[in-house]
Amino acid sequence: MVDKRESYTKEDLLASGRGELFGAKGPQLPAPNMLMMDRVVKMTETGGNFDKGYVEAELDINPDLWFFGCHFIGDPVMPGCLGLDAMWQLVGFYLGWLGGEGKGRALGVGEVKFTGQVLPTAKKVTYRIHFKRIVNRRLIMGLADGEVLVDGRLIYTASDLKVGLFQDTSAF
């Protein structure tokens, strides 16, 4: 049985990456450096834009984060794909929070828009995930819209983020 708390610390997220938070069969978050959040501040089964579930998480920004040193030299900016991956990570985390089992895999996204950037001078990135649908059959899948904010300003949106949980990924 999953302990369905409303918030999770960095240590909780690291435990998820080790397969300890949602059990041996539950989905795992990636380990650092690909773990793109420091904490989950809110998780609910209702709420969000569609009243079908909501997740909000945060990443503290500092100039020493690994991607600023290589993307780009002399023009550091967080790669937009990392913000997109963070949203997929949170959809999979939510499926585990609901009790889903399997290995999480991103299955797609409808549309992504980038209207801003994360620079090393920023303080905090906030991710907001609004669930539209959860499929809980042979395939467990989450469908959601997401937003990325930097210091309170909306900079990315994504529609129809899809993540599935698979018992066997050998044929995937």
From Swiss-Prot:
InterPro entries: FabA, FabA_FabZ, HotDog_dom_sf. It holds the Pfam family FabA. Coiled coil: none annotated. Induction: Mainly activated by FadR, but minor repression is also conferred by FabR. It is found in: Cytoplasm. NCBIfam families: fabA, PRK05174.1. Belongs to the thioester dehydratase family. FabA subfamily. Irreversibly inactivated by 3-decynoyl-N-acetylcysteamine (DNAC) which binds to the active site and forms an adduct. The lineage of its organism: Bacteria, Pseudomonadati, Pseudomonadota, Gammaproteobacteria, Enterobacterales. Pathway: Lipid metabolism; fatty acid biosynthesis. It comes from Escherichia coli (strain K12). Changing P76L: In allele FABA6; TS. GO terms for molecular function: (3R)-hydroxyacyl-[acyl-carrier-protein] dehydratase activity; protein homodimerization activity; trans-2-decenoyl-acyl-carrier-protein isomerase activity. Disulfide bonds: none annotated. SUPFAM superfamilies: Thioesterase/thiol ester dehydrase-isomerase. This is 3-hydroxydecanoyl-[acyl-carrier-protein] dehydratase. Keywords: Cytoplasm, Fatty acid biosynthesis, Fatty acid metabolism, Isomerase, Lipid biosynthesis, Lipid metabolism, Lyase. Transmembrane segments: none annotated. GO terms for biological process: fatty acid biosynthetic process; unsaturated fatty acid biosynthetic process. Its EC number is 4.2.1.59, 5.3.3.14. PANTHER family: 3-HYDROXYACYL-[ACYL-CARRIER-PROTEIN] DEHYDRATASE, 3-HYDROXYDECANOYL-[ACYL-CARRIER-PROTEIN] DEHYDRATASE. Necessary for the introduction of cis unsaturation into fatty acids. Catalyzes the dehydration of (3R)-3-hydroxydecanoyl-ACP to (2E)-decenoyl-ACP and then its isomerization to (3Z)-decenoyl-ACP. Can catalyze the dehydratase reaction for beta-hydroxyacyl-ACPs with saturated chain lengths up to 16:0, being most active on intermediate chain length. Is inactive in the dehydration of long chain unsaturated beta-hydroxyacyl-ACP. One of its GO terms (cellular component) is cytosol. Its main location: cytoplasm. The active site is at H71. Homodimer. It catalyses: a (3R)-hydroxyacyl-[ACP] = a (2E)-enoyl-[ACP] + H2O; (3R)-hydroxydecanoyl-[ACP] = (2E)-decenoyl-[ACP] + H2O; (2E)-decenoyl-[ACP] = (3Z)-decenoyl-[ACP]; (3R)-hydroxybutanoyl-[ACP] = (2E)-butenoyl-[ACP] + H2O.
